[in-house]
Amino acid sequence: MINVLIVEDDPMVGELNKRYLSQIDGFQLKGIASSFQSALHILGEHHIDLILLDIYMPGKNGLELLTELRAQNEAVDVIVISAASELDVIKKTLRYGAVDYLIKPFEFERFQTALSDYRRKQKVYSTHRNMSQKELDAELFQKKEATEKVQLPKGLTKSTLKLIWSS
């Protein structure tokens, strides 16, 4: 089982994430934290593999929590689930090791994809001690191939999207 901590200050959104999580096999909720401090407390009490992290929270925000976790060398993965759609925030979270980023509001299917991809990768990482370049490439680029088939929003071209992500 993958142990999950939800960090979300809005109780309704936290409950929604909890219900979504309960519909996906292989994940066990260890707690819901509504603040920076309560997240650190739960992390100290339980072994957590994955944090579903909101950015906008009162007091210290989710980005500050992510920064703190990396400063402490915490070996915990993070999927950001936030209304923060500013590119600089997205890029910072990815630089600090977020494995995925969902912008609120989102559909269950996108949530499910993020967690299923995470579960699949954890299975690969836990069953391999070494990987060949071919195996690694298949793992790293599997998601890219799937997302290229997704229809882009009106007015957004593949080349514009590549420019945004490369900046």
Regions found by a protein language model. Give the residues of each.
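C-terminal output/effector regions of signal-responsive regulators
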Residues: 136-167
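Acidic, metal-coordinating helix/loop segments flanking the phosphotransfer/catalytic sites
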Residues: 32-50
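Receiver (REC) domain active-site loop signature in two-component systems and cognate sites
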Residues: 57
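Conserved acidic carboxylate
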Residues: 8
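Acidic catalytic/metal-coordinating carboxylates
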Residues: 35, 61-64
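Short amphipathic alpha-helix used as the core "switch/output" element in two-component signaling
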Residues: 63-74
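Active-site residues of response regulator receiver
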Residues: 54, 82
